Amino acid sequence: MRNYEWVNVFRFIFFIFFALSVSLISITAVDAAGSKEADTHDHGHSSHHGIDGAKLPLWTIIPFAGILLSIAVFPLVAEHFWHQNYGKVSLAWIVIFSIPFLIGYRGDAWYEIVHIVLLDYVPFIVLLSALFTAAGGICLKGSLRGSPAVNTIIIAIGTSLASWMGTTGAAMLLIRPLLRANAWRKHKVHVVVFFIFLVANIGGSLTPLGDPPLFLGFLKGVEFFWTLKLFPVMLPVSILLLIVFFVFDTLMFKKEGAAPDDGEKQPLKLDGALNFVFIACIIGAILFSKSLADGAFKDETVAEKMAPKIQKAEGEMAAAKDKLSAYVSSNSGASLDQSNAEYYQLRTDHLHAVAAVNGLRAKKTHDENLGVDIFGVRVPYANLVRDGLMILIGIVSLIYTPMYRTVKDDHGHVVPEENAAETNLRAANGFTWEPILEVAKLFIGIFICMIPALKILQAGVDGKLSNVVLAVQSSTNDPINTMYFWLTGILSSFLDNAPTYVVFFNTAGGDPTSLMGPMSQTLLAISCGAVFMGANTYIGNAPNFMVKAIAEENGVKMPSFFGYMAWSIPILVPVFILVTLLYF
């Protein structure tokens, strides 16, 4: 099918989805209007504003499924159309979702969209852009031949660095040298795939700097170095995958012809090394903003005011748990499912009590963070300082290692001017803005369209995905760590892994002291699931997509969305099953 024909097909699909969305969301909103309790819901799902996920029907996640399917299918069936129009496709799904959503839920819908853009998407893309810019100004020059040993060493170094400079920083630093080292090889897709597995995901397990889910845990009170407890899991997983990679790369290497003669061997050297300092400054900005949030930009009176309410709610939560446990222990022969009304009521009472405590904790965090209200959303001053510093650092990096002049080639691609690589470090490094632009355009659609899925999950036992919440709990609502690991991981593969982590963190009680203490295995399961299984898909973690885009820029024919999963499932799932048997 020609490009213009695909445009017409897409327009038809767009209008069909738009019409259906307007009708269905409007009907649902009218249905819910009579019993709207979003601001005063006594289960604590909504701490201040926004939509109660318990009232959202499951079909509202269709636009989210639509944008994921677009990412998966269009590159397969309409590759040229996709590369020319992926930003428009993302925008189309935003419109399909947002306009009916706003018509149906009005102010609450507006709040949710602005909230996820200002507090999730903007920090997300600012951090990625800053790391992308700084790392793109570091160029490893010299003779580097992509043998199995060299490739394994590069991936191992990246895996080690990822926890300390972030998965994005480590991936952006090393992907270009790795691609240049293997440019002469025909069989190199697997090199990039394993790089995504290890450097862009699993390597970021050991500190809150490594991956966004762990940083959110840090913001919720998990100690900075607690995440080192993931080391006994991360190390054997990394070693096992490196061994598998080395064996596979050795087999592929034997299929290659003789390596080309590059002439006189050049010693390795790093240009633009000052950008390492800029990357360190980005990490420093993150930690500095946390100290500001805990100090100068914190209203200390809020904790004192909220303490009695939180203590009362925690007492009610403990009492509800005791009642549930007592019933289960004294009714061992009873059916412990929804068919037993008394049992199910006790179980949901406890889960509602947990949600109420989490709601009060969220309200406390919201109220004590001093900030500026933008369209009704409180943006903490600490966030503004952090993002402002990172933007400034990115600008300084561009001043130190400036961009080159570009031209368009015969295919419309932006490329460096002729001979630019000889005089410009970023040109020599193959640096372009296209990978970060692709992530920015696609992920704004993903973030906005996933609002219903996140709200339904946050609604817990009252939401249409209540079975997910119940699946991680035993009959007495004690955690089932195996299920926490797998469900956090599976959802993190398709949703943003940071809010998914928070959903299950709160489902497990949301108390960092308890989760670092007697429930440490549960927190370990949630953390491993969120970080490790981000490697399952291209959208599981943002660096995955950026690495894919850079590889394609360098002539590597990367697998499609489903093609990538054809690698990740047979390689990673057996490893995760082994992790389950050994640790959870």
Annotate each PLM feature.
Residues 29-33, 79-80, 98-120, 132-147, ...:
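Transmembrane alpha-helix boundary signature
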Residues 60-71, 85-100, 121-130, 271-281, ...:
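Hydrophobic mid-bilayer segments of alpha-helices in multi-pass membrane transport proteins
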Residues 83-94, 118, 122, 144-156, ...:
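Cytoplasmic-side transmembrane-helix entry/capping segments in multi-pass membrane proteins
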Residues 100-101, 162, 173-187, 191-193, ...:
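Membrane-interfacial helix-loop connectors
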Residues 116-128, 226-244, 373-392, 484-487, ...:
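Alpha-helical transmembrane segments
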Residues 187, 206, 216, 225-270, ...:
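Juxtamembrane and boundary regions of transmembrane helices in multi-pass small-molecule transporters
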Residues 279-503:
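Transmembrane helical segments that form the transport core of multi-pass membrane transport proteins
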